[in-house]
Amino acid sequence: MKKPNPIIKYFLTLAILASGFASAYSQDLHFSQFFEAPLLRNPALAGIFTGDYRIQGVYRDQWNSFTNAYRTGSFNGEYKLPVGRTDDYLTIGLQILYDKAGSAGLTSTQVFPALNYSKSLSNRRSSYLSLGFMGGYVEKRIDISKVTTNSQFDGAAFNPSLGNGETFPSPDIHYWDASVGMSYNGTFGTVQQNSLFFGLAYHHLNRPMNSFYQNTAVELQPKWVVSGGARFNVDERSEFTVQADYSYQGTAREVIGGVMYGYKLGEFTDDPKYVLGIGAFMRIGDAFIPVIKLDMLPLSMAISYDVNISTLSTVSQGQGGFELSISYKGFLDRENSAKNKMLCPRF
């Protein structure tokens, strides 16, 4: 197979990196294991898990076929508190997101506290309606010395000694951002382990300025996210989990969804300590995503890889993004633990 001309490949790479730089202004970061970053989907998904507390981390390494890969890390923690003598509960959380992208070293750091109130809708404590809020501080920064433009093309070749022709008032921007969401979760059927949820979130409700040129007309567009999922037993040892998100922000649309098959290991299948999972997800028009997951309660780990199926697959050599997620959740030794307080959803 004929190798692409190195000059053509260079400019294609430069164009893709530039488009990634532009997309950082207008679109949000995303994970293929979106189900392992619940607060980024919807603040009203905080606390929807089996336990009193949960700590999660996701790391994404994208487009390693290029010199400067895109690297993203997410960390979130959640802690559930009972509300008086009722079956309601309040979840307090924290979402931290860090991203570094492209040759210009564009970095983004976000720190968002979150609150989610879950109202019990059943005296069996098997269904809840939640209202969540998340808001905090964002910093974005670029390395001006690494910004390249077509002004550095001297007619024959790229010349880094030429000025890039750009003047930035500041190499960083800071702003406050906020999200709000609602969700419903509950059990269904005759098996307690069968559960489902639906959610709707509205991100960037304050439309913060998002310009290194201090242009107040350049706003971060609001984003709507519709989420849904279900987990159900097939037999004593087998279960399926279905998850999907539809989001739109400005002119951008994204649909991602898929299914995981879980096989329960060990003696106690009603409350298994070990579950081996394998599944596949699809980001429509962009990537096919195989996933392997292992639950070793209270610890869970998952690995996924994006197989690029978009028009960029030729330049990226079919390489997409590798992701690793780790989750730790458990109950506290207390009288009002969620273990005794509610029938927890299984997500």
Whereabouts are the PLM-identified features?
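Bacterial N-terminal signal peptides
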Residues: F11-G20
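Subset of outer-membrane beta-barrel
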Residues: Q27-F347
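Bacterial N-terminal signal peptides that target proteins for export
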Residues: K2-L12
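Sec/Tat signal peptide C-region and signal peptidase I cleavage site
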Residues: F21-S26
